[in-house]
Amino acid sequence: SNPRVKGYFIEAVLAGIMLTVAVAMVDRWTHRLIGQWRGGERSADVWETLAIVAFVCAITVWRGFAVGVAAGVLVALLVFMRNMNRSLVRSRHTAVIEPSRRVYPQAQEDFLREARSRIVLLELEGALFFGSAERLAREADVIGADARFVVLDLRGVGSIDASGAMLLQQLSTGLGRRGQTLMLAGVTAEHPHGRRLRAFGCFREAPRSDWFADLDRAVEAAELQLLSDAGIALGDTAIALQDSSLFVGLDASQCALVQGHMQMRRLAAGEVLFREGDPADHLYVLTRGSITVVAGNGPEHLRQRFVSFSAGLMLGETAMLDGGGRSAGATADAEAEVFQLTQQGLDRLGREQPALASQLYRNIAVHLSARLRRATSLRRQATG
């Protein structure tokens, strides 16, 4: 019954009511922004926007509501002008300049050398919002009719608003009517961009065949589709061992002799052929399926793809010849079949059939030379 105690109680109740009302007054956009940050989306744009919110709140508390609103409007105008003046499309080129890391047999590579010009790559940077979305639409309008795929690399995009998401959906539909396919690199169902697009009601169908974790995978999918459209055999087709790159220039009897020194091994999808750091005592000839060489032994999203091999090619020869351990791991992308040749088997052929062994070493050298030439050519094209 003490009046002072009653006063404290009333003040506490009023304070709670005021805090509840204050929290309810926070706009949904800020709630969503904080939710994105708490959900792990820590991009530069999110940090910048949170900093602006904190700045405006601090000015409001310090100088009052009117000054806070004025400061918020001024900062928003400055950020808007900067984003409007920033070019959303950082670079534009074709897959001729930036092909995938998959290595193809010579016949397929010869076809793709020109066909890659039909894969247009647009690297985006900044925020995809209503002000920049229109510029992206204009960029897409000037893409030639000969293009088969348009790949948007969204890894440099900090945020996507509702208008940006709608533009991507409309762009996908519009290109589809023209017989072209839109691919989004840097977008998966678990990625913030993927969640944002679906939250805005876009790209709701699942699973998505046009979303890829990175640009390399998107370009590879486009290359494989171009090969399929042209009726050229893909990696699922088995290739005879004598038609592989290791057996070039050998007659039937020599092929049989070398094959007698090799062992066949079948791999299930996802099975490891060798791990990073393993002893390098074999080279492998892939006759069916596909094998990818990756760095790191952790979860898939933490591993870096170096190269993927198609049927008919050899791998693991460099580490075997120099005697070092495996510098990366290799995993089967799908059911695969490989023939392995040990260093001891190659040495035995050298003693018993010097001319045959010389041809094998020559084929290995040509294989390595072709990979080096390809890497050099790509670097020269990328640097102008």
Label the model's feature ranges.
Residues 362-384:
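Polybasic "coupling" helices that flank or enter modular domains
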Residues 220-272, 310, 320, 381-383:
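Cyclic nucleotide-binding regulatory module and flanking cytosolic helices
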Residues 205-217, 221:
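Short acidic-hydrophobic, aromatic-tinged amphipathic segments that line or gate anion-handling sites
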Residues 13-29:
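Hydrophobic, membrane-facing alpha-helical anchors
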Residues 151, 212, 249, 283, ...:
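Short aromatic/basic micro-patch
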Residues 266-335, 343-350, 354, 365:
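Cyclic nucleotide-binding regulatory domains
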Residues 24-189, 193, 199:
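The feature marks cytosolic C-terminal regulatory regions of anion transporters and related permeases
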